[in-house]
Swiss-Prot record:
Residues 14-36 are annotated as: Disordered. GO terms for biological process: defense response. It is found in: Cytoplasm, Cytoskeleton. GO terms for molecular function: actin monomer binding. One of its GO terms (cellular component) is cell cortex. PANTHER family: PROFILIN, PROFILIN-3. Residues 24-36 have a biased composition (Basic residues). Induction: Induced by hydrogen sulfide. Down-regulated by treatment with the flagellin peptide flg22 elicitor. This is Profilin-3. Occurs in many kinds of cells as a complex with monomeric actin in a 1:1 ratio. Binding to the poly-proline motif of formins induces formation of oligomers through the N-terminal hydrophobic residues of PRF3. Expressed in roots, rosette leaves, cauline leaves, stems and flowers. Keywords: Actin-binding, Cytoplasm, Cytoskeleton, Plant defense.
């Protein structure tokens, strides 16, 4: 099982060298099963903080279900242990955050319809948050206008589903 801060991805590549100069022997090289390590930070930078129709998330992170930070954008709020516990409780017993709200770094979000045991969504002014639970992690996306809730949901939930399919 990979460590929480690294994920190995096996990639097959084919590299061919070609020159117009006459050669005595073929210089074709084939590389098989090149192993590439993809860090959790790469997932945040390239897959969560990506461009979606000209818009980007305001902040994003991947945290372990214990609240440990695996990777985050520069402006992701400092999440408190009791805030993580509230999120975990809502995944276990959906609806527990609705009366009090969802807190991230002291910011309160009104909980809106999510998917029981899979996704929590919150709204705050012109923005909001989507949290996707995976086998080992919590994937967070925070947005403000002009990004739409649907765009945030798509980015966060697609990465979350990919991680679930990868056993993460």
């Amino acid at each position: 099982m990979p460590l929480p801060h690294t994920h190995s991805l096996v990639v097959s590549t084919l590299s061919l060298e070609h020159s117009d100069k006459p050669q005595r022997r073929s210089r074709a090289k084939v590389k098989k099963k090149k192993k590439t390590n993809m860090s959790w930070q790469t997932y945040v930078d390239d897959h969560l903080m990506c461009d979606v129709a000209g818009n980007r998330l305001t902040a994003a992170a991947i945290l372990g279900q214990d609240g440990s930070v695996w990777a985050q954008s520069n402006n992701f709020p400092q999440v408190k242990p009791e805030e993580i516990q509230g999120i975990k409780d809502d995944f276990t017993t959906p609806g527990t955050l609705a009366p009090t709200g969802l807190f991230l770094g002291g910011n309160k979000y009104m909980v809106i319809q999510g998917e029981p045991n899979a996704v929590i969504r919150g709204k705050k002014g012109a923005g909001g948050v989507t949290i996707k639970k995976t086998t080992l992690a919590l994937v967070f996306g925070i947005y403000d206008e002009p990004m739409t809730p649907g765009q945030c949901n798509m980015v966060v939930e697609n990465l979350g589903e990919y991680l679930i399919e990868s056993g993460l």
